[in-house]
A protein has these predicted regions:
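Extracellular adhesion/carbohydrate-binding repeat motifs centered on closely spaced tryptophans
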Residues: 1-152
Length: 152
């Protein structure tokens, strides 16, 4: 109930913090749904852009508390979140294609060593195949992404 003795629903700002109240006027905390979409509010009820750890998995919610999916740039770093909202790390697939993100979840063009083999992923984290230019040099990768050699 707000100061005017009426029940608030939806987003409501108090001071510098925003909160979400359901149809019964109850402040939401933790994970909750709005129109079938996943949202998150801190234990205080405050809604803000933030990382959320659930068990050993990481998720990110935007300024409205909505769980993000797909590619996101957060504090200058690129990440990919599955349709479940789960931050991807290490090797993962998008539409059957192989992608890689560091164990921190960050995505960038880089060499990746797996066992004794080397692979290269582009700025979207996608594993390259065929001939691919890296630092001005043409490198050859097989159809599984395994680095074969540098072509002079």
């Amino acid at each position: 109930i707000a100061n005017d003795d009426y029940m608030v629903t939806g987003y409501y700002k108090v001071g510098n913090s925003t909160y979400y109240f359901d149809e019964n006027g109850l402040m939401k905390t933790g994970w909750f749904k709005i129109n079938g979409e996943d949202y998150y509010a801190a234990s205080s009820g405050a809604i803000q852009a933030q990382w959320v750890k659930s068990l050993s998995n990481w998720y990110y919610v935007d300024v409205d508390g909505k769980m993000v999916t797909g590619y996101q740039t957060i504090n200058g770093a690129k990440y990919y979140f599955a349709s479940s909202g789960l931050m991807q790390k290490d090797w993962f697939k998008i539409n059957g294609e192989d992608y890689y993100a560091a164990s921190s979840g960050t995505i960038q063009a880089q060499w990746v060593k797996s066992g004794r083999n080397w692979y290269y992923v582009d700025t979207d984290g996608k594993m390259v195949t065929g001939d691919y230019i890296i630092d001005g040099e043409v490198n050859r990768f097989d159809n599984q992404g395994l680095w074969m050699n540098q072509i002079n």
